[in-house]
Amino acid sequence: GFIPSPHCPVDTLMTSQTAREDYMGIFEDKEMRLAGLNTSGNPLSPLPDVGPRHAYDLRRAIELAGKLGITDLVCMSGTPGSDRHAKYPSWVVNPWNGVELEVLEYQKSVVDLFWREMDLRAQDAGVKLALELHPHNLVFTPVNFLEFAERIDARNIGVNMDPSHLMWQGMDIIAAIELLGDHIFHVHAKDTVILPGIATRGVLDSSFGPVPDDPDVRVQTGMEHYCSSWPSDPAWRFVAIGNGHDVTWWTNFLRAIRDVNPGMNINICLLYTSDAADD
């Protein structure tokens, strides 16, 4: 996926039962349990050094999760190019004319074919795939997840409920949880703060800067591909829980998740930024 995994030696774990037992023993010795694996990326990118590699990583992650006895695997739907000859991924967010609708129809055909295969692989491995509704993915809202799931008759594909990605879109998170119901397979507790910049930028802001020159502060999104620099006065920003929404909000969130599945793990997503360090 996007981020290397030095904490999880995939090659060794794939080939050695002893290595798998030793690896899981690290957590058991500390009375901990792995709630899931993560292989977020763009397995459908037309970039030759991204899409094929991320798809390969996902297939292996499904197999590895099954071998480790880990049920949940967080991933992303990915975004294909606009057509079969496209060089770059194309994220359509407002298909107000026929051209964008044609792009979406092509992308759906690519996404559906790929994820039908992943669903079968997940069923064979006894693994549940939890799609993160993340920006720059074809599946990024509760509604288009449900449309997607119906098209492919998804059995082992659901949602990773990370509310931070729905907050910046202006959604009612509780309503989203109620709509998705038992399609929610996994939960990330991560917050988003809405900032004054939203007044003039809106939520679909393209004022990002170039990749930082300093390699120590770059965030990798693929082989030799990195995140752009965040705007200096953004409309919104991802933050640790409590820095965007208060205790009452998070209490209601947890209650809504409990109503869907009382045994659901709540996986806190820790974020570090230079802004946080200055506070």
Where are the regions a protein language model picked out?
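Glycine-rich, proline-tolerant flexible connector loops at the mouths of alpha/beta enzymes
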Residues: 1-22
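A structural motif
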Residues: 2, 70, 184, 262-263
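Active-site acidic/histidine proton-transfer and metal-coordination neighborhood
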Residues: 28-29, 43-159, 251
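Acidic/histidine-rich catalytic cores of soluble enzymes
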Residues: 37, 101-108, 112-241
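Conserved active-site loop/cleft motifs that coordinate metal ions or position small ligands
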Residues: 186, 264-271
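A short, acidic, amphipathic alpha-helical segment used as a generic capping/interface helix at domain edges
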Residues: 245-259
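Conserved small/polar residues in nucleotide/adenosyl-binding loops
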Residues: 272-278
